[in-house]
Amino acid sequence: MAQFAAAGKAISKKNLAEIAMSYGYVYVAQVSMGANMNQFLKALTEAEAYHGPSLIIGYAPCEMHGIKKGGMQNCQLEMAKAVKAGYWNMFRYNPTLENNKLTIDSGDPSADYQEFIANEARYARLAQSFPDRAKDLFEKAEESAKERYERLKKMGKLYE
């Protein structure tokens, strides 16, 4: 098993959705089926109807995430927790709409980010191996998630 970032990744991950939206002609949605099935289905329907390229990015835990409480039988619940903690934002961007091109479907984070990542063994392994580094990286990841959400809200206002 390859563990490319077993010691933690110090830089922020790329934001594929923002990159695609910057083109201005790509339908983009970020979904989490376990958090909101209706939003997931709406995104699929809109993407299929869109005359142009569409990109749907879904949050889907896998066995390697190592969900501590209940394992993969709780993956739908884990998807909902990711959204509530602000780890994953749900939205739809439709460039053909005149108003409200960007719809944010997930609300403000309402759950503890650190508690969410503590429930996944992939993060717990880092905390066991490099506790100080893990604490620092987890705090940076939470801050990055907050910044992503704030940037998304600002983009939403631009597209009103």
Each model region followed by its residue ranges:
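Glycine-rich ThDP/TPP pyrophosphate-binding loop and its adjacent helix/strand module
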Residues: 1-107
